[in-house]
A protein has these predicted regions:
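Hydrophobic N-terminal alpha-helices or hydrophobic patches in metabolic proteins across all domains
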Residues: 2-286
């Protein structure tokens, strides 16, 4: 007879017989399923509806980042054998799928990113994949938690930037903490979803993903590209808030009307152009 322990050892040996690259691809698949397809629902029909809404709510930058993760893992060392720690991490990620806490998938992502970046420093492709995974975790989980902690100050900073611009171009400006307006007749309150911080973390996700896709090694000039992404997102967001504070009609247009779409596309294209320039040009000249 074969004991459970023997079966367990045979299973581990069988997993170790796989190439390390294949093992880590399966790890990425498990993480992807947790992030995109683990949607609670009471029935299959409800699940499909919730899944469609969930996938549609994700930014294009999220999907670009996942393409980068799988591409970098696929380009990693071909002949390296799987390690016991790889199997343990994969099994831990799969087992974490039974937990219902929303933070669990992000903690699994963070742990996997750290594993790639620390354990695989000699394989620059896997280290780069870890950087993209960390950017995903920062955008989806750690960034919002950080924002909650510093929300008061970050929202005041956004309001101060817009208030200063209004004061320089209009008279009779109303400005108190996070309340700003061009006149007594109209004011807006800067809430969390309007903050530049959310778009900054998304812009940095695009920058990291495209940079790592183009070249796995960082160069010194990359920091300036990242800062350019941050500055552009802040400038565009402040411009939108400025226009929303001018009057009721302007608010409707830029908050829920066509202006909202213009802002979204302008931000997306600007971040893409800057990130692509940094990925394709900066690396050649540094």
């Amino acid at each position: 007879m074969t004991s459970g322990a023997d079966l367990g050892r045979d299973g581990v040996r069988g997993a170790l017989a796989l190439g390390r690259r294949e093992m880590l691809v399966w790890l990425a698949v498990a993480l992807l399923c947790q992030q995109l397809f683990a949607v609670p629902a009471a029935s299959l029909e409800a699940y499909l509806g919730e899944l469609q809404s969930h996938l549609a709510s994700k930014s294009i930058f999220t999907y670009v980042a996942w393409v980068a993760v799988f591409s970098l893992i696929a380009d990693s060392a071909r002949q390296a054998p799987a390690r016991t720690s790889d199997v343990v991490l994969l099994l831990a990620v799969i087992a974490s799928g039974v937990l219902t806490a929303r933070s669990v998938p992000w903690l699994a992502m963070t742990a996997s990113a750290a594993y790639f970046m620390v354990r695989d420093r000699t394989d620059i492709k896997l280290s780069a994949a870890g950087a993209v995974m960390l950017a995903l975790a920062l955008n989806g989980f750690w960034g919002p938690r950080l924002f909650e902690f510093f929300a008061y100050y970050l929202l005041q900073a956004d309001a101060a930037l817009v208030g200063a611009a209004l004061s320089a171009t209009h008279t009779g400006v109303q400005w108190s903490e996070t309340i700003i307006g061009a006149s007594n007749e109209h004011s807006i309150i800067v809430y969390g979803p309007c903050s530049s911080f959310h778009n900054i973390s998304l812009g940095l996700l695009c920058w990291v993903a495209l940079t790592k896709l183009a070249r796995p090694r960082w160069v010194k000039a990359d920091i300036f590209v990242g800062l350019a992404v941050v500055a552009t997102v802040i400038a565009l967001n402040a411009s939108r808030l400025y226009l929303m504070a001018l009057g009721a009609e302007s608010f409707e247009y830029w908050h829920v009307g066509t202006g909202q779409q213009i802002f979204a596309w302008a931000t997306t294209l600007s971040v893409l152009v800057i990130s692509l320039y940094g990925a394709l040009r900066v690396g050649r000249t540094s």
